[in-house]
Structure formats: C-alpha cells, structure tokens
C-alpha cells in the first residue's frame, strides 16, 4: 500500500490570536468532499475559558473558526464529530478535570451553521459516556460503536458504548485490563508539555501513578469482528478484539507498536488494510514527535511505517484520520498553537 501527501495546510491563520492553546481535533467529511474540523481551545487545557471551535473546508480553503460550544467557567474537552443522514453530531466532554468530566451532545441539521442546545448524552449518568477522542464506528449491523474510556486517580479503563437506535440510547461494554503498579519513570525524553504545565494536572507524582489504557480507535474487519487499538501508560499500544459486535471483549494486550502515552487514530480501508497515525515513541509521557503514518495489510498483525508527517522537535499529537474515497483526511495538534490538515492519497 502506497501513501502520498497531496495537501498540508494550517487550519488557522499563522500568528492568529483567537486563543492561547488548541488541541484534540476531530474531522468529518460531508457530501461533495467538504470537511468540518472541531477542537477545543482556550488559555490552556482545563481552563474555564476553553470551548469547542469549528472550521469548514470547502473549495480548498478554511473558513474562520467559530465557537460552537462554551459555558463560562467550565472546561471543554475532546470533541468528536459524526455525520449521519444529513445530521452533524458533536460530542464533547465538560468538567473541572478529566476525572470528573461528562459527555454532552449537540446536533446540527445545516452542516454546522447552527446547533441545538447541549444535552447530556446519557441523562442521569455522571460517567464519561460515548466517544472520548476518536470517531464513532457504524458497524455492519447498523449499530453505532463509540470508543470510550474513563480515568480515575489511579486506573485508566477503556470501554465501548453501543447504540442500536442511532444515538438515542447507549449500552456500555467494558474492555478488560489487569492493572498493575506503575514502574519507574525516567525523566529523559519526556513530553515537554509536562514541564510547561500544558496538561490539566501539574502534579507529576500523581501523573506517574496512573496505569491503564484509554482513547480506543475502532474498526470492524468482518461482520461482527470488531477491534480497538488503545493508548497506554505502558510504552506500547494495546489491542482488544470482539466477535459479537462489541458486546464482549478479550483482555487487552500489548502489540508491537510503541506508544508515548498520547492519542492515536486509525482507519480501516477494507481487505485487512489499516492506516494508523501515531508518535512512534516508547515511554510513559514521552515526547510527542515525530508524528508518523504506519500501514498494515493483515488486520494489524504487522505494521510498516509509510510516511513521517512531522520530524522536528515539538508537540505533534492527537491525530484524527478518516477515509473518503481514495483520500485520507488527517488532522492533528501543532504545538498547541494550530491544527494541521493533511490529505493523503492511498493506492494498492
């Protein structure tokens, strides 16, 4: 499988003054090859002025960003866009911190020009239900699968939320993981954001006691056979598999891909072909560069690096990837000051 980069653009004007920091983008394709991209932004991650912002890509140009979800004094996080039958869904988290965030959803029937009032995704449930970072999977049986996770002060755990009625109700299915005590953490090659207080939690003793997996990226290899690849605290990506449309999962297990405890995303192209965007770096909270694209032709058993999107020191993180025909659309965080968009063409 061959990949070629055809477009690389900043979503925001260079040197903009819309906000101090931006992070965690999501991308969705509308009919006619048009795109919508959302992210959270404000003074810094976790600050009360963070909001969800949206930009449109049409005829090769990005629109000025607009703020589409905000509430003064309440941190907003990790938007996920989903397009279904003429309706644009926006899922996102709100809360004082990640341990206590909850999920809200808004809908647009005019491609993001206007939005419904926010509502809880699962009324009465204070857990962070629904998608946590990566896109929904619409399975072959028509059900929606939302890759999800929860983080407390010690343990990180992934799960999926399943909807048989197109997002009206959700059923939670856990992904098993045996937790262990975190190992020793060398301070070399750490992500610079830890030193610069870019993370919502600045107590590094607490940060390094977290153990587990979060932020799954999901695909269906054949009807009912569903898989997730997950970020971990353990220096490698973890995987879990299901044979019953995501209702039951095997114990999560490490695969032969490094992970720096930062988000990844992948897309399934059929016939066992997968394209993954990730930081090929091993270590807990290690540096967030380079940013690379890897390919698999055997449903994730083996991987080969195909492209490097960013090589210089910096933070290039939290990628999102979707497929639209033979084009792959990728967005990612650029030093928390911008969002980069890349178009890749695949063949073979």
Q: Residues of each region from the PLM?
A:
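Asp-box/BNR beta-propeller blade signature and adjacent active/binding-site loops
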Residues: 1-348
């Amino acid at each position: 499988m061959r990949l070629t980069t055809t477009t690389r653009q900043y979503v925001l004007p260079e040197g903009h003054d819309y906000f101090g920091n931006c992070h965690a983008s999501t991308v969705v394709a509308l009919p006619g090859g048009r795109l919508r991209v959302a992210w959270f932004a404000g003074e810094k991650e976790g600050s009360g002025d963070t909001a969800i912002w949206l930009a449109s890509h049409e005829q090769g140009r990005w629109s000025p960003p607009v703020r589409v979800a905000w509430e003064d004094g309440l941190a907003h996080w990790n938007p996920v866009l989903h397009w279904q039958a003429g309706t644009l869904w926006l899922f996102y988290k709100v809360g004082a911190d990640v341990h206590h965030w909850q999920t809200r959803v808004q809908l647009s029937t005019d491609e993001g020009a206007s939005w419904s009032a926010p509502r809880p995704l699962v009324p009465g449930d204070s857990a962070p239900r629904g998608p946590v970072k990566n896109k929904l999977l619409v399975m072959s049986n028509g059900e929606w699968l939302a890759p999800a996770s929860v983080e407390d002060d010690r343990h990180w755990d992934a799960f999926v939320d399943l909807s048989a009625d197109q997002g009206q109700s959700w059923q939670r299915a856990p992904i098993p993981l045996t937790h262990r005590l975190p190992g020793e953490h060398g301070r070399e090659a750490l992500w610079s954001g830890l030193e610069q207080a870019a993370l919502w939690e600045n107590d590094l003793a607490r940060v390094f006691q977290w153990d587990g997996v979060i932020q799954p990226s999901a695909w269906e290899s054949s009807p009912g056979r569903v898989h997730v690849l997950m970020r971990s605290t353990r220096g490698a990506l973890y995987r879990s598999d299901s044979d019953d449309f995501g209702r039951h999962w095997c114990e999560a297990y490490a695969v032969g891909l490094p992970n720096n405890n930062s988000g990844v995303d992948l897309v399934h192209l059929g016939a066992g072909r997968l394209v993954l965007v990730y930081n090929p770096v091993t270590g807990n909270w290690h540096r967030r560069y380079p940013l690379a694209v890897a390919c698999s032709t055997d449903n994730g058993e083996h991987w080969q690096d195909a492209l490097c999107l960013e090589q210089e020191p910096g933070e290039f993180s939290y990628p999102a990837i979707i497929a639209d025909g033979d084009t792959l659309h990728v967005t990612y965080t650029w030093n928390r000051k911008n969002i980069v968009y890349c178009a890749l063409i695949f063949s073979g």
